[in-house]
Amino acid sequence: MAKKVVALIKLALPAGKANPAPPVGPALGQHGVNIMAFCKEYNAKTADKPGMIIPVEISVFEDRSFTFILKTPPASVLIRKAAGVEKGSSEPNKNKVASITREQLREIAQTKLPDLNANDIDAAMNIIEGTARNMGITVNS
């Protein structure tokens, strides 16, 4: 028989740098999960993506075991990295902070496609382009 899920925890952690300090410790500790086991597993699986924020969905079972699914980094992080800026514009409709090319947009959309509610790459590109526009980053064709 399948194990019963008692909690679903969503966290966004830096790749390869999860430690028992907040936010990881309190979130997992209240469900009785072995925090160090999670940190070691997460860091091992994300060691090849340094500097990225990787969202993770942790399923905790009633016997205190857990499984987790790694998601793709947030679109805003990928866009900022491609544009080479620290943060987006505070007034995106007035001042633009950077620009990215169509190829960079396609690359980001390709990366995000499994997590987006889109059927093809063009729909994914439109979603990512909207995110970029809201950050004050223009897309050059």
Swiss-Prot record:
Keywords: Methylation, Ribonucleoprotein, Ribosomal protein, RNA-binding, rRNA-binding. It holds the Pfam family Ribosomal_L11_N. One of its GO terms (molecular function) is large ribosomal subunit rRNA binding. Part of the ribosomal stalk of the 50S ribosomal subunit. Interacts with L10 and the large rRNA to form the base of the stalk. L10 forms an elongated spine to which L12 dimers bind in a sequential fashion forming a multimeric L10(L12)X complex. GO terms for cellular component: cytosolic large ribosomal subunit. One of its GO terms (biological process) is translation. HAMAP family: Ribosomal_uL11. Gene3D superfamilies: Ribosomal protein L11, C-terminal domain, Ribosomal protein L11/L12, N-terminal domain. One or more lysine residues are methylated. InterPro entries: Ribosomal_uL11, Ribosomal_uL11_bac-typ, Ribosomal_uL11_C, Ribosomal_uL11_C_sf, Ribosomal_uL11_CS, Ribosomal_uL11_N, Ribosomal_uL11_N_sf. NCBIfam families: L11_bact (TIGR01632). This is Large ribosomal subunit protein uL11. Belongs to the universal ribosomal protein uL11 family. CDD domains: Ribosomal_L11. It comes from the Bacteria. Forms part of the ribosomal stalk which helps the ribosome interact with GTP-bound translation factors. The keyword Cytoplasm does not apply. It comes from Synechocystis sp. (strain ATCC 27184 / PCC 6803 / Kazusa).
